[in-house]
């Protein structure tokens, strides 16, 4: 039997919160949408673009309620949770539209409510539905989601898995200073705050090195060691894994038991409250991933992304909500895994990025033995920063993308100032993603993956109408994501 992730008291509080949400939903129908992502995948940009396109009548041909003209009004409203910071939509959209800079990434949880007035497509529903749906968007770091599996692991299991992973591939080099310090530590010695702090600092430095752009690894729990916030320096964040001898365990008052106690405190103080107060109350979820960056960084980054997706999908229980499950044990009934930055590819490769991500998800689902019902995959660009063109070279027409590289970007030895546009050949993904995974599985040292040019482009310049009103933010397949995530709730 798998270990329980929550206590009976936690379950009771979750059931009470779901009951309160259900009662509120009878008067004001609501869907709680979780938005998270792995390794700079663009959560803030996704939310900002989604809200901007709904508020400003964006081009959403695949979002049926808007395409059919059934949505009559869209507005922002006060969020229901006063203790949760508000997602600062106005600041983020100003950065995108006016300043043409990408907004800061998510470092803590935030929330935003957007409400749609609509006419139901069903005559029966028009009689009984209030014709209003509130979408509570809950934005949280992907590192927090990757912490949830820790609830089912004791300190020994966490230590064994983390230490074993640290000695594989590129992690072996990145973890060398931390592992050297760990091996030199006497776990039987008395608890020592300075030793604990040194180990925790070295462990956090290793996790940060794994996350850096040049590595782009995704499996990085405990996440709050990367984003400590107001818990920085607390005992609950001052711990690290330690190797335990096969026989016996250190006695009371030892460094080992000190670290074990702090690991359990991390779960109680950090992980459980997030699960109980936020995650367990979600109805729908989108997980954004930067699959292009992983491919660009090589086989280990792709394998690590698959490992992270396995851990992520194991957290969900996709399926249909019955009345009883809604009241007592809320179930996330739809999960979308979306590969971002589709605008970095020519449209001919969009379906290939989709297929690559779908294969990653299928492999993750197979590894954990869960059904794929309620899970969808797509490639998208929350904000389209490029346009497509063709150039002639040696008598052949080549598909290219055109955009404004960010200041400091270097392409083929040329450094850009953030003002000048350029055309680049983005590279190709394989038609059959299986060929890519076969190359990775071969285990051959130095195996080459598709060469994809990942360039950081500035957000696009938005044209204005004759009345001086800026058009909505351009995107790729954002409307399709909306349709999957909450289109059915507007039927």
Predicted regions and their residues:
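Switch- and interface-adjacent substructures of P-loop NTPase systems
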Residues: 16-22, 26-27, 53-331, 346, ...
């Amino acid at each position: 039997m798998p270990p329980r992730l929550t206590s009976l008291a936690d379950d009771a509080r979750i059931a009470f919160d779901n009951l309160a949400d259900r009662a509120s939903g009878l008067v004001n129908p609501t869907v709680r949408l979780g938005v998270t992502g792995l390794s700079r995948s663009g959560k803030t940009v996704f939310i900002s673009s989604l809200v901007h396109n709904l508020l400003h009548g964006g081009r959403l041909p695949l979002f049926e309620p808007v395409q059919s003209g059934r949505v009559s009004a869209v507005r922002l409203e006060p969020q229901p949770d006063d203790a949760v910071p508000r997602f600062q939509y106005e600041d983020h959209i100003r950065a995108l539209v006016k300043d043409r800079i990408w907004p800061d990434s998510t470092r803590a949880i935030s929330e935003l409510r957007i409400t749609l007035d609509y006419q139901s497509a069903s005559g029966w529903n028009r009689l009984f539905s209030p014709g209003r749906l509130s979408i509570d968007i809950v934005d949280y770091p992907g590192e927090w989601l990757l912490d949830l599996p820790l609830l089912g692991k004791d300190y020994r299991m966490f230590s064994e898995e983390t230490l074993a992973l640290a000695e594989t591939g590129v992690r072996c080099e990145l973890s060398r200073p931390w592992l050297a310090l760990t091996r030199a530590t006497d776990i039987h010695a008395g608890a020592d705050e300075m030793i604990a702090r040194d180990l925790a600092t070295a462990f956090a430095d290793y996790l940060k090195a794994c996350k850096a752009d040049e590595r782009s690894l995704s499996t990085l729990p405990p996440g709050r060691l990367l984003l400590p916030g107001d818990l920085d320096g607390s005992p609950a964040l001052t711990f690290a894994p330690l190797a335990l001898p096969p026989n016996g365990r250190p006695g009371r008052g030892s460094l080992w038991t000190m670290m074990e106690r702090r690991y359990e405190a991390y779960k109680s103080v950090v992980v459980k409250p997030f699960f109980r107060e936020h995650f367990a109350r979600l109805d729908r979820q989108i997980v954004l991933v930067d699959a292009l960056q992983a491919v660009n960084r090589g086989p280990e980054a792709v394998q690590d992304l698959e490992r992270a997706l396995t851990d992520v999908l194991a957290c969900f229980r996709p399926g249909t909500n019955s009345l009883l499950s809604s009241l007592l044990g809320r179930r996330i009934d739809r999960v979308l895994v979306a590969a971002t930055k589709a605008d970095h590819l020519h449209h001919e490769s969009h379906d290939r990025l989709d297929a690559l991500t779908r294969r990653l998800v299928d492999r993750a689902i197979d590894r954990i033995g869960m059904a794929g019902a309620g899970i969808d995959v797509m490639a998208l660009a929350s904000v389209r920063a490029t346009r497509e063109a063709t150039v002639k070279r040696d008598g052949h027409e080549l598909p290219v993308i055109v955009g404004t590289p960010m200041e400091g970007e270097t392409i083929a030895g040329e450094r850009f100032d953030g003002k000048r546009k350029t055309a680049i050949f983005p590279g190709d993904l394989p038609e059959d993603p299986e060929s890519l995974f076969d190359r990775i599985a071969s285990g051959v040292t130095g195996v080459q993956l598709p060469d994809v040019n990942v360039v950081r482009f500035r957000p696009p310049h938005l044209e204005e109408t004759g009345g001086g009103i800026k058009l909505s933010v351009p995107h790729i397949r954002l409307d399709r994501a909306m349709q999957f995530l909450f289109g059915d709730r507007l039927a």
